Amino acid sequence: MGLEEKAGDLGIVTTTLEGVVNWGRTKAMWPMLFGLACCAIEMMAGQASNYDMSRFGLELMRASPRQADLMIVAGRVSRKMAPVLRRLYDQMPEPKWVVAMGDCASCGGVYNNYAIVQGVDEIVPVDVYVAGCPPRPEALIDGILQLHEKIKRDKITDHADGKPIRIEQAERGALKPLG
């Protein structure tokens, strides 16, 4: 006797709180584009009707990091631009994710010199790397789907100021209960 037989036509679904929260996070992401080169053009092509990235929860690009939870770094990052990238990342609220789009963002690309950062993972933690020079919009969509799978495995407590919330903290009064 399965759950469907017990519940009848009531439409009962059993899940976990983390499952619901992570499902919501994958369906309503607020990306901020940090486009610096030709990869940004492919990113814009991905927003066109041919690819319609809004199907994957990427409806609107945000200009402010305070309204974004996903940073897409598309293109090469110079050493002078690195502090700006870090400052924008630090201004994003938790939970936040980073996608390195293209070979320049992932590993410096063909620019192996003193002025170009050899991968943005030297500056910010990267969740998904999208390969290509420049990567096609299909590759970016695949990277977003990989990020969705990573988000679905997340724990809610992993995103509290970057540290898990412990029961002891709540008992000591470090965390105030709601209500």
Swiss-Prot record:
Enzyme class: translocase
Cited NCBIfam families: nuoB_fam (TIGR01957), PRK06411.1 (NF005012)
Gene: nuoB1
Family matches, as HAMAP family: NDH1_NuoB
Cofactor binding comment, as recorded: Binds 1 [4Fe-4S] cluster.
Localization annotation: Cell membrane
This protein's GO CC annotations: plasma membrane; respiratory chain complex I
InterPro entries named in the record: NADH_UbQ_OxRdtase-like_20kDa, NADH_UQ_OxRdtase_20Kd_su
Highest taxon in the source lineage: Bacteria
Quaternary structure and interacting proteins, as annotated: NDH-1 is composed of 14 different subunits. Subunits NuoB, C, D, E, F, and G constitute the peripheral sector of the complex.
Main location class: membrane
Pfam families linked to this entry: Oxidored_q6 (PF01058)
Protein name: NADH-quinone oxidoreductase subunit B 1
Similarity comment text for this entry: Belongs to the complex I 20 kDa subunit family.
GO biological process terms held by the UniProt record: aerobic respiration; electron transport coupled proton transport
Function: NDH-1 shuttles electrons from NADH, via FMN and iron-sulfur (Fe-S) centers, to quinones in the respiratory chain. The immediate electron acceptor for the enzyme in this species is believed to be ubiquinone. Couples the redox reaction to proton translocation (for every two electrons transferred, four hydrogen ions are translocated across the cytoplasmic membrane), and thus conserves the redox energy in a proton gradient.
Swiss-Prot/TrEMBL keywords: 4Fe-4S, Cell membrane, Iron, Iron-sulfur, Membrane, Metal-binding, NAD, Quinone, Translocase, Transport, Ubiquinone
Known EC number: 7.1.1.-
Cofactor(s) named in the record: [4Fe-4S] cluster
An annotated Gene Ontology molecular function: 4 iron, 4 sulfur cluster binding
Catalytic activity entry: a quinone + NADH + 5 H(+)(in) = a quinol + NAD(+) + 4 H(+)(out)
